[in-house]
């Protein structure tokens, strides 16, 4: 099994090069055409590119993604790659520059997420991590990450989500009146920026996120010393052997803020 740091480097290379491809293709008319289900030409082009890069870099790899699907074997020595080729596709297809590419690697036997990278398609550097080896912003290791932003990142585009998020916002603003609320359109990128402190609290209470959407970013938050929970304040569990929902996600570098967001602390 390849070590976590090598896998981090591969995840950075693959996510960054795919982000470059998407940047070069941006705003082309044909990219929004649906090829199957909810998969567009842009999704398919990016995923095919990722699959080719992964095979060139690693040889044997078990890929779990929306288009390719897949069920990984627990007895294989090949690492599992959880891939989201384009998070924030609505933004991307609308020529809005907030979207990202996510690649995470997991141990097929234990299910432990070992490494990953979230690369912005447009401005900014990838956020990456290797389990037990630290987290990185671009090529620099993030030392003692702490919250420096005042943004609460939320998602409310599902029935009931507005009410749930409103409670979280009210509790958090009771702690810090200067918190600002934003909903930007790429959950993976917002989680990644939570890992390095640019976003103070991430709260997606729609119960619709999948493992491929957040595996890399959740790993980064945890490696940077933050916490990631479900809507009940329990540590978020992420399966890695097939595409599956992980539900609602709350994250912060400050455990107290995450607890307040889900109603388990006082403000």
From Swiss-Prot:
Catalytic activity: a myo-inositol phosphate + H2O = myo-inositol + phosphate
Residue numbers binding Mg(2+) 1: 66, 84, 86
Superkingdom of this protein's organism: Archaea
One Pfam family in the UniProt entry: Inositol_P
Residues where Mg(2+) 2 binds: 84, 87, 213
GO BP, sorted A to Z: inositol metabolic process; signal transduction
Keywords, comma-separated and alphabetical: Hydrolase, Magnesium, Metal-binding
Gene Ontology MF annotations: inositol monophosphate 1-phosphatase activity; metal ion binding
SUPFAM superfamilies: Carbohydrate phosphatase
Cofactor field: Mg(2+)
Magnesium listed as a keyword: yes
Database matches in InterPro entries: Inositol_monophosphatase-like
Chain positions recorded as substrate binding sites: 66, 86-89, 182, 213
Listed EC numbers: 3.1.3.25
PANTHER family in UniProt: INOSITOL MONOPHOSPHATASE, INOSITOL-1-MONOPHOSPHATASE-RELATED
Protein family per UniProt: Belongs to the inositol monophosphatase superfamily.
Protein name: Inositol-1-monophosphatase
